[in-house]
Amino acid sequence: MSPAMANPRVRKFNPIAFTPLPVTFITTIVYLAVLILVLVTYLVVPPAPTLEMSPKGVNLTEAWRDLQHLTEGFHPYNSRRNDDVHAWLLHRIEAIVRESAAADGGPEVFVFDDNLSNLTYSNGGVSKSPIVGVYFESTNIIVYIRGSEDDPQNWWEWSNGKPKGKGGVLVNAHYDSVSTGYGATDDGMGVVSLLQLLRYFTTAGNKPRKGLVLLFNNGEEDYLNGARVYSQHAMSNFTHTFLNLEGAGAGGRACLFRSTDTEVTRFYKNAKHPFGSVLAGDGFKLGLIRSQTDYVVFNGVLGLRGLDVSFIAPRSRYHTDQDDARHTNVDSLWHMLSVAIGTTEGLVSYTGTDFDSKTTDQDKVNSGGGTLGVWFDIFGSAFAVFRLHTLFALSVTLLVIGPLVLFITSIALSKTDRMYLFSMSKSLGGASETVSLRGLRGLFRTPIILTVTTVISIGLAYLLEKINPYIVHSSQFAVWSMMLSVWIFVAWFLARVADFFRPSALHRAYSYTWIFIVTWIMLVISTVYANQKGIAAGYFTFFYFAAVFLATWVSYLELFSLPRKGYYARQASRRQRRRSSSLSSRLLTPSADELPSDIGPNGAENVGDPDETDPTESTSLLRGQRTTFANYRTGGDDGVTEYTAEDEHVREASIFGHEQSWSWTLPRWTWILQLLLLAPIVIILVGQVGLLLTTAMSQIGSDGVSTFIVYLACALFSTLLFAPLLPFIHRFTYHVPIFLLLIFIGTLIYNLVAFPFSPANRLKIFFIQEVNLDDGTNKVSLTGIQPYLTDTINAIPSAAGQTANCTQGPFGSLVRCSWSGLPPRVVKEDPGNDQTMGPYTWISYNITRTVGKNEARIKVSGRNTRACKLKFDNPVADYRISGSAVDHRLPHTSRQGVEEIRLWTRTWENTWVVDVDWHSNPVNPGESKDGDEKQDVSKNELSGKVICLWSDNNESGVIPALDEVRLYAPAWVAISKSADGLVEASHDFIIQ
């Protein structure tokens, strides 16, 4: 007799069986492999090609040198360095155009240095406050590359000239930076990408079919002024599609932030390394993302259709002095450039008419109308894009078909008497005898585990929010590790305990059924949002549910391999009768403890492998007391055939542990099919969305936003990521869960006690200095979160001995603290004039009131600046800027009136002439947007402030207070601007 026959409990190892070792090993490998790929996609930027492998017409070495030159200093609109950058860009553009002109086959190129356009508008479309007026003068640089199919005439030179033929393509980047950042990614990489696009499309063989407009806009950082004033240039009537290149982080991959429609998004598929998700765009729709880009002007004002591509992380370097070339790399530059080349090449080569049909809004270009889209990348190598309507239709179909298929399958199982799910027992014909099936075991196990693990994860989110709320700022992956490890350990522990006391072969089927129900509800919610609000962010729930449905269906189909319940019950009853007969014939009746464990009180089999002596050649094949129906065919009903010991051995080897004895015919390999159907797609899509969310939001705490939303996202996405493990986790060995328990303990301690900021992940604190020119006093204000703001102020020498005046900040948990600081030197005084004494002469203004009317003319000029503003204690009804254009597409004023007018000019120390009227549209007395009472505007008086701004921070000693803060602030603090100006000086005025 063979060894296997000699010992019935010896099992041949099956590497794919649903047993602990294969389940633990294969599941761990699958999860690790896909998770690592997702992480690599997010953390590793594709390498830039060598010079030899670069596309024809692209020079990355030149692009990197351009970026280094561009970021040599701060260059906000209101700085001398900004003029230098403007001149340098013109020089670089002219050099590239000359080189292309020298070569044969190059296209015509026209360069417009726009020093004529200006615009007055209200910022109601950007900010929540609708009553801030803006006057802005353009210093944009516009480059037009004529396409081979464009109108050959210079139509822009004619009075009221309009382009003929198909619309062109606009690619935009802004060359101004903030006053506290060098602008390497915001938006230096976009600017040098435009220079390389100019070189690429003027290279022989790369001539565009449709015209290409490259807009180097100036003034984006201050209310998107550069893009708005572009609307006054003739080229704004020519372009129908656009690609906006932005930077809201400081490196990594350039992300497709949002798009207007499906049709234009399809051109992004041409990108060599696509990266992004529709989730970000829906964040803007839902108001979760407050900042804006030029995208809203090109689409909302001009009616163009296009894409917004931006760097998104790390935000701790955004708008700080670490947004420089040293803290980014050529790989990130290449990623943005390759995206720009691929997308733009597709747009300028398109021959269809999708972007040239008429629109219902006559104030916008005829770019046609698109459809809402769904899009996401896969490992940064492939890109999926389709219509939201398609997703809606598929979702509705699947919501109906999924339950219907399972229902029909359940009916078929019931008809064939194999529906063990929800079956407690089986009656034997008309007799009162019943056989226990134990089919309800494991029914409520999965919802209990899901609830407990999720509640614990959310509890940890609350704990972090209370104890160390900003740890995610620098330790995002420590938080992820804590959430994931505790979820898996708790789920494993609960599943193992449940399996120990109530083992069930139906654990997988019940788990998938519950996950099916939960994901069905998720898909219903996602589908409703998609249909009613056009929100596509729940796209992953469709694929999640589809995979869960297939995996659940496999579990239901498995049940067809089981014996009929009636057949199993009859065989169990026969065995009981034979056992009773055999036992009564014995001389000694064994005690209850000696009865075989597979005989239950009602005659059903209990499973298990009780200790017994090994059979010998003289042992009966019936094995005495352990009879079985293993020899009977599952399709038989009444036939009884002699079975062999070999069948008995196969049966014993097929039943796992103490699970139901009827389960021995279940396939042992289908769990792998279910794992591969569900786990990879869930990890890829859910993991991508989870990482995108937490990466974008991990550092929102420095902006005053509660970080609980980040921890909650980690908790919920942990559940979504590892819910596919629930059908298998009870089979895991203890090694992986115990290891994860140790990781949880370590990361929990770290997350609770570690300092949340570091030199690599600094806390942003916002600076402004305000000077009262009437009495010469000044105050330095820092805005940030407590207690770290106080720690920073305590390190500043000029604040020593003073009590900082702290008030609630402009948003969320931000606090603003002020003290008397070092006086600024933004205006060079005449020798012998001590500028620390007031009054200063930095601002000149004159106010003339029209006799008999509530109208006045205010003339304002500031020294060494080109940015000022008028702030009124009560809103004025209307205003006009001398020489300004007004565009009816952009709101000029509002019914609430205008409480502030911001003035920007391309000329240094310019004089603005502003006419205001506070009579034609009076504002209700005693009302203000902040809820504070103001003076009765029915009076014929108007009071307010004349303020000028200084933003040039390139020379040490000009703003000593800022130099001091940077020098003495802790290494984990980054200084960013609090407003348009670093220094604001003001005079009070009253018009009587």
Swiss-Prot record:
Cytoplasmic topological domain: 1-24, 412-446, 496-508, 555-671, 730-736
Cofactor details (free text): Binds 2 Zn(2+) ions per subunit.
Major location (coarse): membrane
Enzyme class: hydrolase
Pfam families: Peptidase_M28, PFF1_C, PFF1_TM
The protein's name: Vacuolar membrane protease
Membrane association type: Multi-pass membrane protein
Residues with glycosylation annotation: 59, 115, 118, 237, 805, 846, 954
Protein family per UniProt: Belongs to the peptidase M28 family.
Entries under CDD domains matching the protein: M28_Fxna_like
Any single Gene Ontology cellular-component annotation: vacuolar membrane
Membrane spanning stretches: 25-45, 391-411, 447-467, 475-495, 509-529, 534-554, 672-692, 709-729, 737-757
